[in-house]
Structure formats: structure tokens, C-alpha cells
């Protein structure tokens, strides 16, 4: 139908050609020009292409056209009409309604006289009427005859446009009512009262006494059988110009007004009564057949057709009926999805019931007390509940208590008579764990003593006087050409500054990694173990040793007159009692000796604490096992039968 102007299809026949620069160029449109550099639209009948500017059709307008025919084709064949795409479901419903209307002899549609109020509400619509107003339909239809509507018909058309929200005055007793009665035919049709939701009307007691339809208002005889002519809504009266209603014409409902029903309504024969036209949710359609069955008493309290099981009928009892709640009407699409979900759930429930009957045939007669097994409770003769051995919880508790009183004393006596090897092994294991705990505590006390001794040595060393002698500086200038490589970065360094460089290089690389835990360390009696600095980004506490953490601690600035103070040793381990008295800045042999000694003591203390924690966990597990071994549940479930006490004693002769 429509195409890009750069690649049109040349028609096979019915076009002239002329030569330009020695080449044959096809010509198009009513202007007979070969121009293809603009928007073009093609006829779906003769396949001729036309420029949009020549026929006054833009590219945006063409997107809404489904089938387009040129003027010549429409003149030759009046049946050809331009068809448009429908963007909304209301437009589609309007098109179908227009296509089902009767036509006159010339093929044109018969249109009623447009109502000014309705046209004002519709505005610039997008339906078929708006398309005809723009001149996009076929111009060769016979002009319709002007139709004059009676005042009653004009009033009915206006009343049909009133929405459901406008059918309430808000002042009468029915409008102020907030609960459904649950007894009328409209309530029994609702889903919350177990109905099929076919009529979809408000409770009769909640129908407005001023603005609601007369057939929907409450009247005492609504629950009694009525004639079909009284219960069914009357069809719309035909217009004066129509002689007979066409078969395709749909009859609509009218709203019965006070005083106008008896004078203007003409009864139609049963043959002329057709199915009412389906309306939207706002019009609240009424199914005539179902409504007639309701009024005739077909849906009484004991004969509801949608009752598939006797278990689903207790809602009719006033004591068990739920209180009615005001339910808002939602859109049709949402209702359809809800109906699909309910139907799917009902099918699933039916299949599940069928499977349960095949898998558990004994449940089929669960309602029959004679088919149920007897309760196993002591002295109880009542039938057991389905899928249970007892008729109630009390019977089960009584039987369990009697079983404990009967079996437990004998099991306790057997437990006391025969020795338990696992119990003896547990006692020995507890003794060994306690010895290890005692040794760990002794080791911890020793490390605490060493910690305080080291602090005293460091304090005494700082009180020494600085002394610069040539003997201590001997060998510092030797081997200046010798180089070693750093273990962290691999760079060659001088042995004189090797310790200083390696310590700083290690701290730089170590600070790039974090070691943390979600909880701080709290150990009674322990001081200066972990760093425990909180990191708000990772929400963790640092778990490095406090004296070695390069991330959260820095070496203090050394003054010029501070002494080194490192204790001097002989043969590596033997202390001489003297201290290094070189200035701390110049001593390359004892770099950071205080930090390393403190870290050594703290690391040993941490190891002892870890050992104690492991021993506490082992003790807890052993005690839990020993407690559960002679408990009520273990004695009731397990039993050891000792047939020959002499040959089955697993203890060794030394243990006896």
C-alpha cells in the first residue's frame, strides 16, 4: 500500500513513458512525473503509485491506513473503501457496530440524527464517523435521508450515555448503604457469595431510588417468579424511517423512566426479540436468560447450578455467610485475567482431587465414620481423624505419657546396671582436656610475665647515656662495594642499610592488604594484642598485631639524642647485661628492635589464646555428648540387650 519513495515498484500496465537523456524513466501519479524522491502511496487495486503531496496524504496519515484505493478504482467499483487501522478496542467495536448497521439502496449507511450533546462529548474522535467527516471514505455513497428523533428517543440516548457513577444521588438510603444484603438475586450472582458473576449488578438494596433503572430497584416481588416480559429489558424502538428491522441490526436496552414506560413502550413479539447488545463494564450488562432463571427461582438455596460439591454450600447459611464488602468494578481486561486465573485454579483443584482419589482410595469415604480407623488413644473408641491415628491431640498426648511411664523406668535401670564404654571414654577425654587447659593457662601467665619484663628492659634502656666510640663503629665502612637484594622489591641495596630498607619496603607492601573481622576482640586480662581499628567502608575491625600494623600505626619520630638501647648478647642467646649506646638514628644493626621483640611476645600470647579457645570448644562438645547420651529421648529410642554379661563386656581387664 505505502512504500518508500526511493524504491517504488513500477506498474505493469496503464502508464506512459518518455525518454530523458536517452533512458526510459517510468512516470507515476496523476501529475505523470517520474519523481520518486518524495513520499508515495500505492493503490491496492491497480498497483499505481501516487505522490502524497498530489493527493494530500502525508506519511503520518498513511500509517493509519490499512487498505487504500485511488479515486479511479473507487469510481469503477463502489465496493472499494479505504480501510483504516484501529489503535484502540473502542474504535474496533465502533467499526463492527457500523458494519452491522443496515444500508440503503445506494450502499450508504443509515445514520441517525447526530445529537449535539453527544457530538460535544465525542469531540474530534478517531472512529469511523471522524473518518467520514475528514472525507477519507468513499465519496460515491448515497446521502442519507434526514431522520427526526422523537423526544422520548432523544431522552433515552442521553440516559444511555450516563455512566454508572452518575446513577447515584448520594442522598437516599440506598446510596448510603455500604453492605450488600446477600439475599437478592444480584447478590447471589456475586463471586463473594458463590455466584457465577454473570449479571454483574449491585445489590438491589443499594440501587439508587432516584437515578437507578426501574428494573434494578428493590421490590419485594423480585425474588418471586415473574414473567419474562417483565424481567427482560425491552429493546430499543426502531426509527420511523425503518420499515422492518434487519437481521444484522442489534437491539439495545433503554432506560425505563417514571411515567414514560406505559405510554411509549410497544411490546414486541417473541420472534422479534433479539439478544441485547453487549455493552461495556460501565453500562453493567444484564444477561436475559440468566436473569429470567434468577427471577423464576431456578437459583434457590438448594438448587444452585454452580454448586459442584456439597462442601461449597455452607456460605448460604446466614451464620456462616461473610459480611458483604463494597467491591469496585474494574476494567474488562482485568476481569478477564481474573476469570482465567480462577478457571485455571478450578481445573487444577479438580485434577488434584482426582489424583488424590486414585492415590488414596481410602480417603474417598472419609466422611463416613464407619470407614475410618479407630483412634489409638488409651480407652478411646472414637474414629480417628483423616490422615491421623488419633481422634484428637489429647489422645496422642495420653498415649505418649503412658509409653514414657511404662518404658522409661526399665531403660534407666538397664542403663545403671550395664557400664557405658562411651561414657568412660568421655570422662577420660575431659580429664585430658582439663590438663591441657591448665598447661595453656600456665604458658599464658609466663608470656604475660615476659611481656612486663620486656617493657621494663625497654624503659631501662632508654635511660642509658649516648656514647660514641670508634670500637662500635668499626666495620661500618668495610665492604662498601658489597650489595644484597631486597626480599620484597628485589632492588640491590647496601648491607649497611639493608635492615632499614627491608623493614620500610615490607610495611609498604603489607599496607596494601587488609585483614579484618566483623567483631572486635575482647579478651579479659589481655592488653595490646590486635589493632581493632574500625573500617567504615568494609565494616570490619583490623586483626593485625597492634605493634606490626603498618596501615594504622607509624613509627614514632626518633629524636637526635635518643639511645638505641638494644640488649647485647653473646653467642646469639646469652645476654651480657649491657646495652647498645649508639644514637638510634646511626645504629643500623638494631633497627626497630623494640617493635620486633614486642611482636614476638604478642604473637606467642595469641597462639596460647587460640589454643585455649580450641580446648574450650572440645570440652563443650564432649559435655554435650555425655548429656545427650543418658537423656530421655536417647533412652526411649535406643536400647542395648546384653545377652551374656561376661563375654560382651568391652572393657579391658585393667579398666574393670
Curated annotation (Swiss-Prot):
Residues 90-120, 335-345, 359-368 have a biased composition (Basic and acidic residues). May be regulated by proteolysis. It is found in: Nucleus speckle; Nucleus. Residues 239-249 have a biased composition (Low complexity). GO terms for cellular component: cytosol; histone methyltransferase complex; nuclear matrix; nuclear speck; nucleoplasm; nucleus; Set1C/COMPASS complex. Residues 1-14 have a biased composition (Acidic residues). Zn(2+) 2 binds at residues 181, 184, 187, 203. Residues 321-334, 346-358 have a biased composition (Basic residues). GO terms for molecular function: cis-regulatory region sequence-specific DNA binding; histone H3K4me3 reader activity; methylated histone binding; unmethylated CpG binding; zinc ion binding. The modification Phosphothreonine is found at residue 227. Residues 1-20, 84-162, 219-287, 311-373 are annotated as: Disordered. Changing residue 169 to A: Complete loss of DNA binding activity. No effect on localization in nuclear speckles. Pfam families: CpG_bind_C, PHD, zf-CXXC. It comes from the Eukaryota. GO terms for biological process: positive regulation of DNA-templated transcription; regulation of DNA-templated transcription. The modification Phosphoserine is found at residues 6, 19, 124, 224. Ubiquitous. A zinc finger (CXXC-type) spans 160-209. Keywords: Acetylation, Activator, Coiled coil, DNA-binding, Isopeptide bond, Metal-binding, Nucleus, Phosphoprotein, Transcription, Transcription regulation, Ubl conjugation, Zinc, Zinc-finger. A zinc finger (PHD-type) spans 28-76. The acidic domain carries the potential to activate transcription. Component of the SET1 complex, at least composed of the catalytic subunit (SETD1A or SETD1B), WDR5, WDR82, RBBP5, ASH2L/ASH2, CXXC1/CFP1 HCFC1 and DPY30. Interacts with SETD1A. Interacts with ZNF335. Interacts with PRDM9; this interaction does not link PRDM9-activated recombination hotspot sites with DSB machinery and is not required for the hotspot recognition pathway. Interacts with histone H3K4me3. Transcriptional activator that exhibits a unique DNA binding specificity for CpG unmethylated motifs with a preference for CpGG. This is CXXC-type zinc finger protein 1. It comes from Homo sapiens (Human).
Amino acid at each position: 500500500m505505502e512504500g518508500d519513495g526511493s524504491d517504488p515498484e513500477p506498474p505493469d500496465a496503464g502508464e506512459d513513458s518518455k525518454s530523458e537523456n536517452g533512458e526510459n524513466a517510468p512516470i507515476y501519479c496523476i501529475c505523470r512525473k517520474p519523481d520518486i524522491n518524495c513520499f508515495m502511496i500505492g493503490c491496492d487495486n491497480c498497483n499505481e503509485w501516487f505522490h502524497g503531496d498530489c493527493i494530500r496524504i502525508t506519511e503520518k496519515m498513511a500509517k493509519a491506513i490499512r487498505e487504500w484505493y485511488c479515486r479511479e478504482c473507487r469510481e469503477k467499483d463502489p465496493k472499494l473503501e479505504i480501510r483504516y487501522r484501529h489503535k484502540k478496542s473502542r474504535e474496533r467495536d465502533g467499526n463492527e457496530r457500523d458494519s452491522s448497521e443496515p444500508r440503503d439502496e445506494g450502499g450508504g449507511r443509515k445514520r441517525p440524527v447526530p445529537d449535539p450533546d453527544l457530538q460535544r462529548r465525542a469531540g474530534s474522535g478517531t472512529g469511523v464517523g471522524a473518518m467520514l467527516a475528514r472525507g477519507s471514505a468513499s465519496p460515491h455513497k448515497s446521502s442519507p435521508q434526514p431522520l427526526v428523533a422523537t423526544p422520548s428517543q432523544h431522552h433515552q440516548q442521553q440516559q444511555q450515555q450516563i455512566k454508572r457513577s452518575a446513577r447515584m444521588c448520594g442522598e437516599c438510603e440506598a446510596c448510603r448503604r455500604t453492605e450488600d444484603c446477600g439475599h437478592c438475586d444480584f447478590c447471589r450472582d456475586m463471586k463473594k457469595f458463590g455466584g457465577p458473576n454473570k449479571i454483574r449488578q449491585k445489590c438491589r438494596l443499594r440501587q439508587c431510588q432516584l437515578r437507578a433503572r426501574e428494573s434494578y430497584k428493590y421490590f419485594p416481588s423480585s425474588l418471586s417468579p415473574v414473567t419474562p416480559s417483565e424481567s427482560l429489558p425491552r429493546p430499543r424502538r426502531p426509527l420511523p424511517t425503518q420499515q422492518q428491522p434487519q437481521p444484522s441490526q442489534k437491539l439495545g436496552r433503554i432506560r425505563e423512566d417514571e411515567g414514560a414506560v406505559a405510554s411509549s413502550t410497544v411490546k414486541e413479539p417473541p420472534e422479534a426479540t433479539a439478544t441485547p447488545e453487549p455493552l461495556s463494564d460501565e453500562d453493567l450488562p444484564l444477561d436475559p436468560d440468566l436473569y429470567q432463571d434468577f427471577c423464576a427461582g431456578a437459583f434457590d438455596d438448594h438448587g444452585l447450578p454452580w454448586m459442584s460439591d456439597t462442601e461449597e454450600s455452607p456460605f448460604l447459611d446466614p451464620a456462616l455467610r461473610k459480611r458483604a464488602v463494597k467491591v469496585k468494578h474494574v476494567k474488562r481486561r482485568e476481569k478477564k485475567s481474573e476469570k482465567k486465573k480462577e478457571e485455571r485454579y478450578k481445573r487444577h483443584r479438580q485434577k488434584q482431587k482426582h489424583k488424590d482419589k486414585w492415590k488414596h482410595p481410602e480417603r474417598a469415604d472419609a466422611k463416613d465414620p464407619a470407614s475410618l480407623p479407630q483412634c489409638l488413644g488409651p480407652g478411646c473408641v472414637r474414629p480417628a481423624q483423616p490422615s491421623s491415628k488419633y481422634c484428637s491431640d489429647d489422645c496422642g498426648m495420653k498415649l505418649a505419657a503412658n509409653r514414657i511411664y511404662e518404658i522409661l523406668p526399665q531403660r534407666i535401670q538397664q542403663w545403671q546396671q550395664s557400664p557405658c564404654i562411651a561414657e568412660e571414654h568421655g570422662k577420660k577425654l575431659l580429664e585430658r582436656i582439663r590438663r591441657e587447659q591448665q598447661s595453656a593457662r600456665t604458658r599464658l601467665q609466663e608470656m604475660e610475665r615476659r611481656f612486663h619484663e620486656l617493657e621494663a628492659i625497654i624503659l631501662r634502656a632508654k635511660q642509658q647515656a649516648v656514647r660514641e666510640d670508634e670500637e662500635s663503629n668499626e666495620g661500618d665502612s668495610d665492604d662498601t662495594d658489597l650489595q644484597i637484594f631486597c626480599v620484597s622489591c628485589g632492588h640491590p641495596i647496601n648491607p649497611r642499610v639493608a635492615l632499614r630498607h627491608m623493614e620500610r619496603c615490607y610495611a609498604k607492601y603489607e599496607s596494601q592488604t587488609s585483614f579484618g573481622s566483623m567483631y572486635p576482640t575482647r579478651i579479659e586480662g589481655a592488653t595490646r594484642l590486635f589493632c581493632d581499628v574500625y573500617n567504615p567502608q568494609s565494616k570490619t575491625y583490623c586483626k593485625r598485631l597492634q605493634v606490626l600494623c603498618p596501615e594504622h600505626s607509624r613509627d614514632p619520630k626518633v629524636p637526635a639524642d635518643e639511645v638505641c638501647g638494644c640488649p647485647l648478647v653473646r653467642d646469639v642467646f646469652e645476654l651480657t647485661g649491657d646495652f647498645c649506646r649508639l644514637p638510634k638514628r646511626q645504629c643500623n644493626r638494631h633497627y626497630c628492635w623494640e617493635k620486633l621483640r614486642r611482636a614476638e611476645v604478642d604473637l606467642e600470647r595469641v597462639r596460647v589464646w587460640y589454643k585455649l579457645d580450641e580446648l574450650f570448644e572440645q570440652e563443650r562438645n564432649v559435655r554435650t555428648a555425655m548429656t545427650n547420651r543418658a537423656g530421655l529421648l536417647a533412652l526411649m529410642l535406643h536400647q542395648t540387650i546384653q545377652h551374656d554379661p561376661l563375654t560382651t563386656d568391652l572393657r579391658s581387664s585393667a579398666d574393670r
